[in-house]
């Protein structure tokens, strides 16, 4: 089963897409250059299964709505576990997967499937984790008592 006719090239990427930034837009633009129909698999909360990941700040529905408003994205499907992601991949039957170049040489869900992988550049320097860390740092610097419930240090 495919979501579009068989004469279209279907591409996809997956992630939680919290705090949408220009780096994501560059990725989506690049993805659309390699496929006719671009699908985003939106993960609910990666922190539930990987403690190294932050819990999303933006609620799921708002992330979904934001992604659906981007002209390069044709469809968004929601998943939580890597098993659910594999099931979505088997249902959609994509031709192309879009991954950041930071995945070069690393294993990832579905890396054993016969799907072409296009690696996109991360040279733009944007990162949700870096943005969250910067916001935290600036908040603490500008409000030094925030962690002490307002008591002077």
Q: Language-model segments: which ranges?
A:
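Nucleotidyltransferase catalytic core that binds NTPs
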Residues: 1-153
């Amino acid at each position: 089963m495919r979501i579009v006719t068989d004469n279209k090239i279907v591409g996809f990427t997956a992630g939680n897409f919290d705090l949408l930034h220009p780096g994501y837009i560059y990725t989506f633009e690049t993805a659309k250059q390699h496929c006719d129909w671009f699908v985003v698999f939106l993960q609910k909360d990666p922190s539930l299964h990987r403690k190294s990941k932050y819990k999303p700040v933006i609620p799921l529905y708002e992330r979904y709505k934001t992604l659906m408003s981007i002209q390069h994205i044709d469809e968004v499907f929601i998943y939580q576990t890597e098993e659910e992601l594999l099931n979505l991949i088997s249902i959609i039957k994509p031709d192309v997967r879009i991954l950041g170049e930071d995945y070069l040489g690393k294993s990832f869900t579905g890396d054993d499937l016969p799907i072409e992988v296009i690696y996109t550049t991360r040279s733009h320097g944007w990162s949700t984790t870096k943005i969250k860390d910067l916001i935290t740092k600036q908040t603490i610097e500008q409000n030094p008592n925030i962690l002490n419930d307002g008591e002077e240090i």
